[in-house]
Amino acid sequence: MPKYFCDYCDTYLTHDSPSVRKTHCSGRKHKDNVKMYYQTWMEEQAQELIDKTTQAFQKGKMGNFGGLPPNGMMMGPRGPMPMMPMMPVRPMGMGGMLPMRPVPPAMMGGGQVMMMGPRPGM
């Protein structure tokens, strides 16, 4: 029967069954090893980026960060900010509710139009 090898923990599991792998992968030591692996990998990637940037800067391939920006990159003076429309202020006694509008008598029946008959006495 083949054994399962965990690359993160650098160990063989006793059986190659899904339940054994699931138990192993949910363990604290395995999770710590996975976290450490990816943390180390990210640190290596960051260091490579730093090294490449340093080499490019030393070779003169990076732009000059000091002084004035290239022509056309200067920003002129800014004008005033446009005013945003203000919401009307309601008195505090309203409690945040919108004012109620009277419902037309023809629309009172659950959204169905009610037919108005002749008035009594006509």
Curated annotation (Swiss-Prot):
Signal peptide: none
Main function: Component of the spliceosomal U1 snRNP, which is essential for recognition of the pre-mRNA 5' splice-site and the subsequent assembly of the spliceosome. U1-C is directly involved in initial 5' splice-site recognition for both constitutive and regulated alternative splicing. The interaction with the 5' splice-site seems to precede base-pairing between the pre-mRNA and the U1 snRNA. Stimulates commitment or early (E) complex formation by stabilizing the base pairing of the 5' end of the U1 snRNA and the 5' splice-site region.
Subunit structure: U1 snRNP is composed of the 7 core Sm proteins B/B', D1, D2, D3, E, F and G that assemble in a heptameric protein ring on the Sm site of the small nuclear RNA to form the core snRNP, and at least 3 U1 snRNP-specific proteins U1-70K, U1-A and U1-C. U1-C interacts with U1 snRNA and the 5' splice-site region of the pre-mRNA.
Protein name (Swiss-Prot/TrEMBL): U1 small nuclear ribonucleoprotein C
Stored Gene3D superfamilies: Classic Zinc Finger (3.30.160.60)
Zinc finger (Matrin-type): 4-36
InterPro entries to which the protein is assigned, alphabetical: Matrin/U1-C_Znf_C2H2, Matrin/U1-like-C_Znf_C2H2, U1-CZ_Znf_C2H2, U1_snRNP-C, Znf_C2H2_sf
